[in-house]
Amino acid sequence: MKKFFVIVGIMALVFAFSGCTAFETDTEALLSPPVFTEEQEKLNSALTEVIGEDYVLKYPENGNTNSAFIFEDLDGDGTEEAMAFYSVLDESTRINVLKNENGEWISVYTAPGFYGNIQKVDFVKIDEKGPVVVIKWEQEIGIYRYENEKLESVYRETCEGFEVADIDGNGFYEVAVFIGSPMRRTIVNMIYGENGKINVSEQISIHAQYDSIYSKISGLLFEDKHAYFIDSEISDGVYLTEIITFENGKAKREFVADFVDTGDSKNEDSSGEIIVLGGNYGERGIFLRNTKIGCLDTNADGIMEMPAEVRKDYAREASESIFFIQYVQHNGTEAVPVWNGIANTENGYLFEVPEKWNKTVEIEKSAASNSFVFCEKKNGNKIFEIFAVSKNDYQDKYEDYILAAEDETKNYYVKSYVAEGNEYYISPEKYTGSFIFI
């Protein structure tokens, strides 16, 4: 059995405590007081008048809001309120809402929170009213709405995390809450607004664990059909795409891959087929692969495509091979290929090649030269080569190559080993348009 690729993501968290930094630490109360801006000093004074001086400000650990004082028009009246997060005597974190009257900040409401740190704060336009406040605590999510100078809790749940997207395309956002499960499945609750009320959809389950999701995007599944596309790593070096739709208050996991041979027998030859199913999953519609790529709109037609591998063995088997990739698009009745090529995930690009190469060409990876080489299967002759070169490296040694594309850090060179007229020849005019950076 071949070995799976092992891709390990490493996240570094930096903790600090100041008026312009984002994180809280366990030693926060022992450090010097933060340096406030003039406006923050006014807020701090207003807060002190209400709760005294024995409190510790709390800071969201990530997201766009990286201050203990956050400004937002909470009730939609055109004027910003301020929110402050704090704890007193190591109690749970509390939320204080302040409003500005004639240039002075005054506290108008205090709401209970939870124990532990604040991981993320978001403001979501869920309906015609003002935004709801979505707070991810250490192990729970809280959703709040500010009306009549009161911050009321409208949803609370233990969860792994949440994502915000306009999944149904109605111009308002839904909050997808990901809840862990002992059955290696993840429960998803969809929080949405309707008729001025906050509602919770019926639960659906997906294979993706929240921490393993590396790509998520909302877009069209096909014309007039909106969806949410999730790509995750379900085990070492094994990746899949799952699709969620949301209509009329109901969430659904879509199955769109009925067109392929699922290959139930390991000994059955499926050379050239797209494999979407394997192992013990027992369901159709899962794009299972060994290449870490996500859903894209490859042809810029406004409809999302899903990645699948074209391979001679089954996707449920471990593999260190480099496979051709097809991006498939759903047309309302079936999924059909619209893009064919290869993926170089280390250097962050896709490169389009003719579909006929899938059965007659092999791909070799050269770690020494950081290149992909395409060779004829029948004789091993080189056809085409792609180099990814750091812009800090000397470029002179690539004089025999064509600079086909570049990004902020790398130049991408190509070389054809066959002449014009050969069945494998790609014209220089097509090189640049064949790259998609991921």
Where are these regions (language model features)?
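Generic cytosolic/nucleocytoplasmic N-terminal low-complexity/intrinsically disordered segments
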Residues: 1-2, 98
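Sec-dependent N-terminal signal peptides of Gram-positive bacterial secreted proteins and lipoproteins
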Residues: 2-24
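Small/flexible residues
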Residues: 4-5, 255, 417
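Beta-propeller-forming repeat regions
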Residues: 19-365, 372, 403-407, 412, ...
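Secretory pathway targeting signatures of secreted, lumenal, and periplasmic proteins
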Residues: 356-403
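Terminus-proximal functional modules
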Residues: 378-379, 387-394, 408-411, 419-421, ...
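Surface-exposed amphipathic alpha-helical segments
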Residues: 416-438
